[in-house]
A protein has these predicted regions:
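PLP-dependent class I/II
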Residues: 1-130
Length: 130
């Protein structure tokens, strides 16, 4: 698929410590990611209903359907980065059914999420097919 992931010893040790000793932190993190997903979904439903934020499935990425945009899937992330300075994962790289979708990182502060959502929705409005 062209996606590679690596890990390092420090990251591995931090992950082990987080799961063994940081339950309150993990709970707050998961609550914040869920709140960020609700915020993003509501913003799209209100301001850009042609594009859909799908139900979360146990990850800190939102899966967003941008097939309503007049952009070829292969060009989507390039244009998004050039016009908004937002870097996302292009869904077509994750398999055939992902064309026209993006993965948007929710593991961020509320301030970053609000600014990114504003830019993403403005981009979608500029490129919507109708």
């Amino acid at each position: 698929m062209g996606v590679s992931y690596g890990q390092n010893l420090m990251g591995l040790e931090a992950t082990i410590a987080a799961f063994r000793e940081c339950e309150p932190w993990r709970i707050r993190l998961m609550e914040q990611i869920a709140a960020n997903h609700r915020f993003l979904k509501a913003a799209f439903e209100k301001n850009m209903p042609e594009c859909k934020v799908l139900q979360a499935e146990a990850t800190y990425f939102a899966w967003i359907d941008l097939r309503a945009l007049d952009i070829r899937p292969a060009q989507l992330t390039y244009l998004l980065e050039q016009e908004t300075q937002i870097v996302v994962e292009n869904g077509f790289r994750l398999g055939k059914g992902g064309a026209g979708f993006i993965r948007f990182n929710l593991a961020t502060s509320q301030e970053n999420l609000q600014e990114g959502t504003k830019r993403l929705i403005a981009f979608c409005k500029r490129h919507c097919k109708h």
